[in-house]
Amino acid sequence: MGPLFTTIPGAHSGPMRPLPKKHVEPMAVRQLLLGNSTMIRHTCPMSVPLSRQVKEVAAQKPSEDIYKNRQRRQQQQQQQQQQQQLDLLFHQRIQISLWPRKQKRRKTEQHSHPFVKKAFRFSAGPGCRRPSSNKMLRSMGGGQRPMGLGSEFFRLLHDLHLLAFATKRIWIHRRGEATARPRAPEHPAPPATAVRGRDAASQNLKRRPGSGTDGLRLQGAEPSRLLRTYAGGAVIPTGTPERAQPPPPQDPLGRRRWLSRNTWGPWPGTTQPPSPQLLRNDWGSCGFMVPEAARGKVFQDSQEGAHIRRETVSKSVCAEPWRHQRARDPAPTNFPLKCQKQRGASTSSGQHGGRVNLVFFIDSPTVIAVPDLQCPTKYSGILY
């Protein structure tokens, strides 16, 4: 009898036996004889035999031997079929090809096994054959390609797990499945000029040898697709030079655009250039030495504010230089402040050593001086 399970190398191992037939007669005949029609309808809808057989079985009396009758009937049918085949062959009404390229399969003959079902799917649906008309060719979606036996064969191998591709399945153009998408062009085409008339519809189609623009060109006329128009629609005469394109915008500071992937100029880690205000007032970042008069005040007067700024900048005591990209964050929590003892800065000694955090507003002359309690707070010297 041989093994029940056979393993093809590379394939999934499964029962190598035919699937059960759709029409299972003995059960149906038995139930017909019992006369229970509801049971037939509920238990086995697929196993109800053809109506002719039902009539024959119902016409028999239950005492007759059904199985003998059926055997006799099968023999008769086989003989009839053989006779018909011989007749056909003899009269040569049929051409026999050993392996037909395409077979029409009825739905009932399709196997219920998932791999096999997927392999035979190519024979159904409109997406597989060549487009029959021009209109279909235009309206067709992207993924449909006409294909010959080659791809069918390879897809069959693939679906039966006899063929494994590590790459994307580029060769399968089936609707709704993963296909390789076309890359976007690096330099997109310039926008098309205004096109009027029937050429507007066919503008995006590939030109075929019979199309209208070729006919026009053969007659010496220029197709309207190639005519440039003004904004109002008037045709620009051929030979007019195009307006010169403006040169690409230069970098304002004239330095190389990208030193590495994410840098701008000499400030590493920043994508944007620092604002000109930041470049002008390049303060130190942490504890500022301020005259006693400035402590805790808000300066509205521009001259006084500017004076405080100047004095503060000249006396700033801090080891950490200002990082320019921090100016974009309203409250950076993470920049390291190495606050040092005052190096001989003359201040009147106070509760916190005369150290004050100034908050500068870049757009206005306002300066807020806030005394700090622990050496500088982590918000010291922030620009708002």
UniProtKB/Swiss-Prot annotation:
Annotated segments matching region Disordered: 1-21, 60-84, 177-255, 326-350
Chain intervals with Basic and acidic residues compositional bias: 177-186
Cystine bridges: none
Transmembrane domains' residue ranges: none
Biased composition (Low complexity): 74-84
Family classification: Belongs to the FAM157 family.
Protein name in the entry: Putative protein FAM157B
Lineage: Eukaryota, Metazoa, Chordata, Craniata, Vertebrata
